[in-house]
Amino acid sequence: MSLNIITEKDKKQSYNLNKLQKRLRRNVGNAIADFNMIENGDKVMVCLSGGKDSYTLLDILLNLRLNAPIHFDIVAVNLDQKQPGFPEHILPEYLKSISVDYKIVAENTYGIVKEKIPEGKTTCSLCSRLRRGILYRTATELGATKIALGHHRDDMLETLFLNMFYGGKLKSMPPKLISDDGKQIVIRPLAYCKEKDIEKYAVAKQFPIIPCNLCGSQPNLQRQVVKEMLQKWDRQYPGRIETMFSAIQNIVPSHLCDSNLFDFKRIRHGKIPEGIEGDIAFDKEAFSPTPLVQENDEKIDFIQGEMISFKEVN
């Protein structure tokens, strides 16, 4: 009898994992298609830190590649920053076990940061700049045409509010960007993925997670405050996070105040400029009492034979 109970439990866990994987595949596949992130012949350099996000990114991209209508290569890259206590064996062992091409780049950025930044001050800004330069250089050396990072939907929303609260800008993380010199394209295939889905997936897949606090840097208190605010909203108002993310995909420049995005000086009597959305000067806007955007876990887009296919991009 106990064996039957275990079997039923295993079946349920397997079903839940399969459902979760399909959702992540769908979200990643849609993001890749919507923003033309990966093209035929690309070599995608997946930046692997050893955290849940980058493990999930690599796993889902490998899964998608099996049935993708285009050919692209994947190489995993980890930057060993020589932090004390960093378990150097974990990532090579894992990557060998799944037969993925990889490169470990050893650079003592930890030592540079400790030398330049006074004790007790946050090291994240300098560390980030150093990492970016090394990863761009590595991408060039490997012939990579795309650099894939593991930022997800929650990261993008947190960044939006951080920029509004502390930077006075309406700015988030772009799903796709080009480096200042025009030589590197960075993509974020997890842009449509929820952090809690990634957390569940990482636990279910038993990825060998490496702690992210080895550098001893001060926590980003501003980001933590924003994260907790969004989590509270998500608990109190189901669907609000989805609606907010939808909002950053539906920008109406004529109803904001940035003259760089919309030329308000063109507005004259008798002529309606292109890009203006409706005359609502004296209207009281009506909103639905519940969020308009509700995620449907059962909706499967771009599926062929249980595997995601990319949209055709002109």
Curated annotation (Swiss-Prot):
[4Fe-4S] cluster binds at residues 124, 127, 215. InterPro entries: Rossmann-like_a/b/a_fold (IPR014729), TilS/TtcA_N (IPR011063), tRNA_Cyd_32_2_STrfase (IPR012089), tRNA_thiolation_TtcA_Ctu1 (IPR035107). Coiled coil: none annotated. Keywords: 4Fe-4S, ATP-binding, Cytoplasm, Iron, Iron-sulfur, Magnesium, Metal-binding, Nucleotide-binding, RNA-binding, Transferase, tRNA processing, tRNA-binding. GO terms for biological process: tRNA thio-modification. Its cofactor is Mg(2+); [4Fe-4S] cluster. It comes from the Bacteria. It is found in: Cytoplasm. GO terms for molecular function: 4 iron, 4 sulfur cluster binding; ATP binding; magnesium ion binding; sulfurtransferase activity; tRNA binding. Its EC number is 2.8.1.-. Binds 1 [4Fe-4S] cluster per subunit. The cluster is chelated by three Cys residues, the fourth Fe has a free coordination site that may bind a sulfur atom transferred from the persulfide of IscS. One of its GO terms (cellular component) is cytoplasm. A motif (PP-loop motif) lies at residues 49-54. Pathway: tRNA modification. CDD domains: TtcA-like. NCBIfam families: PRK10696.1 (NF007972). HAMAP family: TtcA (MF_01850). Catalyzes the ATP-dependent 2-thiolation of cytidine in position 32 of tRNA, to form 2-thiocytidine (s(2)C32). The sulfur atoms are provided by the cysteine/cysteine desulfurase (IscS) system. The thiolation reaction likely consists of two steps: a first activation step by ATP to form an adenylated intermediate of the target base of tRNA, and a second nucleophilic substitution step of the sulfur (S) atom supplied by the hydrosulfide attached to the Fe-S cluster. Homodimer. This is tRNA-cytidine(32) 2-sulfurtransferase. It comes from Histophilus somni (strain 2336) (Haemophilus somnus).
